[in-house]
Each structure stands twice: as structure tokens, then as C-alpha cells.
């Protein structure tokens, strides 16, 4: 309030409900299985880089086009550099996407009812109307309902694959069928933050569907959540629009050191493949053991599982485990309150959690 008792905040800000991130506690040491961080350190090549990096480079502005990093990403996916955009984490990229492609003048944005909870925040921020489409009883996406949108036009569609927080993935055929039926003048955004843990990527479809944009991140599979680096793949038209959006906010979004670390990370394919395989093995081990203890475990292609046990609330599970020094994610949302989301750590982490769950519940 100012001296006259008037609010100094915009009406837009006063109407916002911000995203609530997962806990990053400092009060004690926890086994952190709540924010889908990779349990392994990044590629050792990155440690070597940091030891040798010349800090004098940091007095210079970074390449605003991130050309070298984009070239390396393009080579990895066998696409052109004009198909690649990079930003400070996929969250920033998704914010640009919402601004660049979704306009309430053409209808509501469509996304699943239970999904990444930043989506409605972006909609409120940019004043984009939206429709949440309920999941099917088995927690899979109802693609038919997403396409139909209640018989109304939509300004676009967005969903994670695998979905979060369920971990359930669509097949490539399902995605192709959706794209074949959806209006070609409306952008479809597939958020592939967790695709490397067993899902089928839609990146190979961007040359056939000019309205498809795929968002990826270095946070999960590359163990670089603390770096804040993401990228998107799509048609040159979509990528140009993202650059226009970025340059209207901040031309120099991705720092020099961040770009260099990204280049090194994406080239260490041996490290990447080994760590992904170990996480998948730990996930499958944990899932089967937990089912044996009477838990429902949704089929996951991510680095987490969404689970519940009959007779228990998600809040009870979360609070009891926290007292024991283990953090999982609980969503106080109607329809999924009995579930918790468990990040997959190292196999020994999951074995410890299994023992605690068996003893406590």
C-alpha cells in the first residue's frame, strides 16, 4: 500500500497463485525423493571443466543465440540447428511457449487435469483461458476428450510425456494419431522432461508436423537441475517465434558457463546411458517390491513412481516418512490425495525406503 492506502501491485499480480516447488529443506539431512533429482553426480567431464575454466570469460556476455550448444543438440537428434531453442530450464522455455503460441482469442488451452502444475500458473500469468481434461479411470490421458475439448475450439494443447505426476507414457503411435486429428494451425506442446527413462520421444515427428514443439531439460537425465538449462525442438517457424519472445524479455538468457557445461554434458553419451540404465533398474526393482507389499504402483516410464496403499492417505504417508528423514511428494489435490510421488534414487536408497515402508505401514 502507498501513503493513500492504495495498492502498488497490478491487478494481474494480485490475481496470481504461484507455483509451489518441492521442498528443499535445510533443517536436517533427508533422503530426498521428492523433486525428481538424479541421484548421481553429473558427468565427470563437467568437474574437469570447472577445475580448468578461465573465470575471465565471465566478464563477457554470452552468445545470445547459444549457437555452439544448439549445434551439438542438433547433431544428437539429427536435426538442423534452426530446429533448436535453448533457455534457462524448460520452465522458462514453457513460459515463452505460452506467451508465443497460446491466445484466448481462439479458444481455451487444453491440458490434463492432473499434470505439471505450472501449466495453469502460466495461463493465469498470461491471462489465457484453459480447460483441464479429466484422466481416464486408469490415470491415462483421455486423448479423445483432449481433441474434442467439449466441442469447443482450442488455442492449443500441452501435456507431459510421460505425464507428471503419474509417470504414465503415451506411445508414439498415440501421439501421431493425436497430431493427425488435431488442427494444424494450433500448436501442440509435448513436455518430455522425463522421456529418457523409458518413453518414446516425439522428436522424430517435428519434420512432419510443423505445429509440434517438444520441450526437454538437462535437469533430470543429465543430473543438472542446479544449472537451469533446457531446450526445445520444433519447426523453424516455431523456433523463430521463441527467439522473438526471448529477445523481448532478455537477450542473454543462458550464461556462458551454462552453455559450455551443456555442450559437455550432451556429448558424454556413455555416462548418460549408464546412469539412465541404473535408474530404470532401480525403478523396476522398487515397483515390483512395493507391489508385493500391497501397494498400487502406476506403470511409470519416468524417474519416479506414483503410489498409494489402500487405507492410507497420502498425507499420512508423507508426514510419517518425513519424521523418519525421508522426503516424498504429496499433492493435496482432490482425486490424487491418497497418492505420493516417489523419486527413484540409487538402488540402496530404494531398498532403505522399502524397509521403512514395510515397517511403518
UniProtKB/Swiss-Prot annotation:
User: Which lineage is the organism of this entry classified under, starting from the top rank?
Assistant: Bacteria, Pseudomonadati, Thermodesulfobacteriota, Syntrophia, Syntrophales
Cited PROSITE patterns: AA_TRANSFER_CLASS_2 (PS00599)
Give me the reactions it catalyses.
L-histidinol phosphate + 2-oxoglutarate = 3-(imidazol-4-yl)-2-oxopropyl phosphate + L-glutamate
Keyword entries, A-Z = Amino-acid biosynthesis, Aminotransferase, Histidine biosynthesis, Pyridoxal phosphate, Transferase
In short, the EC number is 2.6.1.9
Protein's GO biological process: L-histidine biosynthetic process
Q: What's the source species for this entry?
A: Syntrophus aciditrophicus (strain SB)
**Quaternary arrangement and interactors, per the entry?**
Homodimer.
Q: At what positions is N6-(pyridoxal phosphate)lysine found?
A: 220
User: Cross-referenced InterPro entries, in alphabetical order?
Assistant: Aminotrans_II_pyridoxalP_BS, Aminotransferase_I/II_large, HisP_aminotrans, HistidinolP_aminotransfase, PyrdxlP-dep_Trfase, PyrdxlP-dep_Trfase_major, PyrdxlP-dep_Trfase_small
NCBIfam families for this protein: hisC (TIGR01141)
Q: What is the protein's name according to its record?
A: Histidinol-phosphate aminotransferase
A Gene Ontology molecular function term of the record: histidinol-phosphate transaminase activity
The family assignment reads:
Belongs to the class-II pyridoxal-phosphate-dependent aminotransferase family. Histidinol-phosphate aminotransferase subfamily.
Q: Name one Pfam family in it.
A: Aminotran_1_2
Superkingdom of source: Bacteria
**Which cofactors does the annotated protein need, by name?**
pyridoxal 5'-phosphate
Enzyme superclass (EC): transferase
The pathway where this protein functions is: Amino-acid biosynthesis; L-histidine biosynthesis; L-histidine from 5-phospho-alpha-D-ribose 1-diphosphate: step 7/9
Amino acid at each position: 500500500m502507498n501513503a493513500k492506502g492504495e495498492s502498488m501491485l497490478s491487478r494481474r499480480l494480485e490475481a496470481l497463485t504461484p507455483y509451489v516447488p518441492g521442498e528443499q529443506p535445510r533443517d536436517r539431512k533427508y533422503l530426498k525423493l521428492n523433486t525428481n533429482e538424479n541421484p548421481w553426480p553429473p558427468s565427470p567431464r563437467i568437474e574437469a571443466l570447472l577445475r580448468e575454466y578461465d573465470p575471465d570469460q565471465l566478464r563477457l556476455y554470452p552468445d545470445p543465440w547459444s549457437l555452439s550448444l544448439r549445434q551439438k543438440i542438433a547433431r544428437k537428434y539429427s536435426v538442423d540447428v534452426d530446429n533448436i531453442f535453448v533457455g534457462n530450464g524448460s520452465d522458462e522455455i514453457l513460459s515463452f511457449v505460452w506467451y508465443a503460441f497460446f491466445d484466448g482469442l481462439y479458444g481455451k488451452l487444453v491440458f490434463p487435469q492432473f499434470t505439471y502444475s505450472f501449466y495453469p500458473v502460466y495461463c493465469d500469468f498470461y491471462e489465457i483461458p484453459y480447460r483441464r481434461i479429466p484422466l481416464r479411470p486408469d490415470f491415462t490421458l483421455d486423448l479423445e476428450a483432449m481433441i474434442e475439448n467439449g466441442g469447443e475450439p482450442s488455442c492449443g494443447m500441452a501435456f507431459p510425456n510421460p505425464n507428471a505426476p503419474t509417470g504414465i507414457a503415451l506411445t508414439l503411435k498415440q501421439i501421431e494419431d493425436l497430431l493427425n486429428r488435431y488442427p494444424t494451425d494450433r500448436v501442440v506442446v509435448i513436455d518430455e522432461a522425463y522421456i529418457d527413462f523409458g518413453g518414446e520421444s516425439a522428436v522424430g515427428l517435428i519434420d512432419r508436423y510443423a505445429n509440434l514443439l517438444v520441450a526437454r531439460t538437462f535437469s533430470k537425465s543429465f543430473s543438472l537441475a542446479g544449472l537451469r538449462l533446457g531446450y526445445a525442438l520444433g519447426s523453424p517457424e516455431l523456433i523463430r517465434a521463441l527467439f522473438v519472445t526471448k529477445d523481448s524479455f532478455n537477450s542473454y538468457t543462458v550464461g556462458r558457463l551454462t552453455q559450455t557445461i551443456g555442450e559437455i554434458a550432451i556429448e558424454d553419451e556413455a555416462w548418460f546411458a549408464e546412469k539412465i540404465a541404473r535408474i530404470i533398474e532401480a525403478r523396476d526393482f522398487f515397483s515390483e517390491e512395493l507391489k508385493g507389499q500391497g501397494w498400487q504402483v502406476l506403470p511409470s516410464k519416468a524417474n519416479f513412481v506414483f503410489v498409494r496403499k489402500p487405507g492410507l492417505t497420502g498425507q499420512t504417508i508423507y508426514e510419517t516418512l518425513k519424521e523418519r528423514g525421508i522426503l516424498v511428494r504429496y499433492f493435496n489435490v482432490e482425486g490424487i490425495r491418497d497418492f505420493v510421488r516417489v523419486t527413484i534414487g540409487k538402488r540402496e536408497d530404494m531398498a532403505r525406503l522399502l524397509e521403512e515402508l514395510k515397517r511403518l505401514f
